[in-house]
Amino acid sequence: MKPLIRRLSRIADSSSCNRNRSGDIHHPTSTYSSSVFLVKRATVASSVPSGHVPVNVGEDKERFVVSAELLNHPVFVGLLNRSAQEYGYTQKGVLHIPCNVFVFEQVVESLRSGIADDTSELIASLSGEDVSTE
């Protein structure tokens, strides 16, 4: 797990401009806050600020930018374990998390608001799977 987290913390988009799904070119801008639990839905491909990791969530692989500090939280470690089980440790590029986007957003919001105790139960109830860290 440590090599995966180290690798994820080094992932950054090195291009100066990127293409979105329709092929239009967008130049990245830095509009990110310095919040510890920053999660921003990336509507277009953009550069990843230092200390953050790009994450694709769900079957449609919606892109989010997540603070690397969030990766150490036990609930997020459970999501990383689920990702490792489904995709293995050999996946390249952006991390894929097999979780419903709504569930992911609720998990992040509960972590941000400090009510993370019920987060594992929330994930299990909405996704039908257990993401315990044991």
Swiss-Prot record:
The gene is SAUR40. Belongs to the ARG7 family. Provide a mechanistic link between auxin and plasma membrane H(+)-ATPases (PM H(+)-ATPases, e.g. AHA1 and AHA2), and triggers PM H(+)-ATPases activity by promoting phosphorylation of their C-terminal autoinhibitory domain as a result of PP2C-D subfamily of type 2C phosphatases inhibition, thus leading to the acidification of the apoplast and the facilitation of solutes and water uptake to drive cell expansion. Plays a role in the regulation of cell expansion, root meristem patterning and auxin transport. InterPro entries: SAUR_fam. One of its GO terms (biological process) is auxin-activated signaling pathway. Its main location: cytoplasm. The keyword ATP-binding does not apply. It comes from Arabidopsis thaliana. GO terms for cellular component: cytoplasm. Keywords: Auxin signaling pathway, Cytoplasm, Developmental protein, Growth regulation. It comes from the Eukaryota. The keyword ATP-binding does not apply. This is Auxin-responsive protein SAUR40. It holds the Pfam family Auxin_inducible. Interacts with and inhibits PP2C-D subfamily of type 2C phosphatases such as PP2C67/PP2C-D1. It is found in: Cytoplasm.
